From Swiss-Prot:
InterPro entries: TPR-like_helical_dom_sf, TTC38. One of its GO terms (cellular component) is extracellular exosome. This is Tetratricopeptide repeat protein 38. Keywords: Acetylation, Phosphoprotein, Repeat, TPR repeat. The keyword Acetylation applies. TPR repeats lie at residues 108-141, 180-213, 252-285.
Amino acid sequence: MAAASPLRDCQAWKDARLPLSTTSNEACKLFDATLTQYVKWTNDKSLGGIEGCLSKLKAADPTFVMGHAMATGLVLIGTGSSVKLDKELDLAVKTMVEISRTQPLTRREQLHVSAVETFANGNFPKACELWEQILQDHPTDMLALKFSHDAYFYLGYQEQMRDSVARIYPFWTPDIPLSSYVKGIYSFGLMETNFYDQAEKLAKEALSINPTDAWSVHTVAHIHEMKAEIKDGLEFMQHSETFWKDSDMLACHNYWHWALYLIEKGEYEAALTIYDTHILPSLQANDAMLDVVDSCSMLYRLQMEGVSVGQRWQDVLPVARKHSRDHILLFNDAHFLMASLGAHDPQTTQELLTTLRDASESPGENCQHLLARDVGLPLCQALVEAEDGNPDRVLELLLPIRYRIVQLGGSNAQRDVFNQLLIHAALNCTSSVHKNVARSLLMERDALKPNSPLTERLIRKAATVHLMQ
């Protein structure tokens, strides 16, 4: 286990060639403490957690611009609040910009402010360009690296997510604080672009330095998922659980991966036990978007497998309802819709669809609203049609956009819920036009992910209704 580095003061940041415009050593150390917790996906109680650190940071130097950029950026990157609906967040962005204009900042700091402001306006690609400008000159700027990594993920820019880290990876020598975590960040981009061996090697290197690196655990979980290595995946999660279960911002998602292996095996009760024991409690405690998405995705997958999830949708509905008008990420919207449909709440369903349609009609520079008309709305309508028992309509909506769904972001494993939706619709369709779609989709799935028990079950189902001939 790597020893924790001391928190960096003004001079230490200067020595790292990342000077911060503040004279407060306390503010500099709290900036480092917050950044460290963000990278580790863990609220460290000994540091006071992210919220505690940000509160103390603001008190230490109320006009510390990078403190504002990080605090506001973290709220935005969480995708649970929009400047359109959250006046406090809107004010925070404006305050950050105003303070930045009153000080002689470095170019790096000015770019950070511009990137956060641009992200707040929904122009994620432009924000990434600004973070990349920082990384060209300052390859060890972890905040720029992490913010861009997360934004690329939301955009479905898989190659950029990988290459962004490849460009700066050689500069992260072992003496730099948090350097081992860069291995994990790089490994995830490699994994999402199907470089599984390279990704696993890097993730395992990171874990040999820090076994508690929950993001590297997460990369390995993905690799086993994508290769249908169910036994290996389950063993890995069981053996490593004690190391990652306290990473409170990612543990729920790692448990979700564990549950996916169980769903793949057809062990539905065991999967529901993980949901009830770990995933739902995390959602109710944190209200984090990742936990909402995990909950909705898991219940929806189980339902497609014919499993009764009882009243569980009712537990998720209040959070989905609260965010149904946000329209920050189309990926989130699709999952909120699963909850409102699953809980049979037509009012929330209608509100989500109507306000999303409105957003798509005047998108401005918002990348998600620009994508809503051609991809987001057809996907959402397909979920509605599936619920209403119109499988042929689901195919008509999804087949033309299936290769564009990656643009909604999320991981390959997360977006697989939409592949499964398409296959189930094809299995249930009645139109002769669509009679060979299920066979085609299943052959494609089997070629990409051989030895998948879930695919084998679907092929058997197709055979019983004579769709594999």
